[in-house]
Structures are given as structure tokens and as C-alpha cells.
Regions:
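Alpha4 helix (beta4-alpha4-beta5 surface) of REC/receiver domains from two-component response regulators
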Residues: 23-24, 68, 91-106
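Active-site residues of response regulator receiver
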Residues: 58, 88
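C-terminal output helix
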Residues: 112-122
Length: 129
């Protein structure tokens, strides 16, 4: 089994269509162990019980947005080093800079294509093994 097939990825987005698009793109790239959450609160609960190796999260969500989730992930010791990628429809430089200060690994602007996602994840996956 390849490394990609073994890695557990958590996709967090409040829009069902977006979750499915990201999941399909990940499957196209060879990832097989993909979980989904509808918001940051649900994602954090999932990470506390069954941590993933990588998180791909939408920026703008109700209850807990992407940066709030990133902060929660970084301050919870068992998940503090989990790679984190933000998806955003409107990349605000100040928000992205805040994300980098919190330990954001990368970001993608929506809409994206699978090749952009592949490039964004290659370096992260390389560091995981």
C-alpha cells in the first residue's frame, strides 16, 4: 500500500459540494483514507478522538472558522504538529499572515484544480515520511 493511501486526511468545509470536490481531488491523487467534517468544531472533536495526518480546511465556516480551527489544532498538544492547509475563496493577505504566524503550512485559492492541490501537498507529504 502506498504512503498516500495510508495517510488519513481530514477535509473541513461547511459546503457539501466543496467537501466532495476536495475529496474527489484527493482520491484522484491517490489518497484513500479521507474523513470529512462540516465545521471546525466537528473537526476538532474528530482530531481529539481519531487524529488525522493532514487537515485541509475551508477558511470561512460557521461556529469555528479555519484560523480558529488552526489555532485549536496548534494549541492541543497531540495535534500541534499536524500539517494544515487552508482553502479560501478570497485570499486576504492579513488573514494569511495571521495563519502563517499560527503555523499554517499552505493555502489554496478556490476554485483550484487537482494539480494545484498536488503541488501544495507534495512538500508536506515528503516531510511526513
Amino acid at each position: 500500500m502506498s504512503l498516500l493511501a495510508q495517510l488519513k486526511i481530514l477535509v473541513v468545509d461547511d459546503t457539501t459540494t466543496s467537501r466532495l470536490l476536495v475529496r474527489d481531488a484527493l482520491e484522484t491523487l491517490g489518497f484513500r483514507n479521507i474523513q470529512v467534517a462540516a465545521d471546525g468544531e466537528q473537526a476538532m472533536k474528530m482530531m481529539m478522538t481519531t487524529p488525522s495526518h493532514l487537515i485541509i480546511s475551508d477558511m470561512n465556516m460557521p461556529k469555528m472558522n479555519g484560523l480558529q480551527l488552526l489555532h485549536a489544532i496548534r494549541t492541543y498538544k497531540p495535534t500541534a504538529r499536524t500539517p494544515f492547509v487552508i482553502l479560501t475563496g478570497s485570499p486576504d493577505r492579513a488573514v494569511l499572515e495571521e495563519g502563517r504566524k499560527l503555523g499554517l503550512n499552505n493555502y489554496l485559492t478556490k476554485p483550484f484544480n487537482p494539480d494545484q492541490l498536488r503541488r501544495a501537498l507534495e512538500a508536506i507529504v515528503g516531510r511526513l515520511h
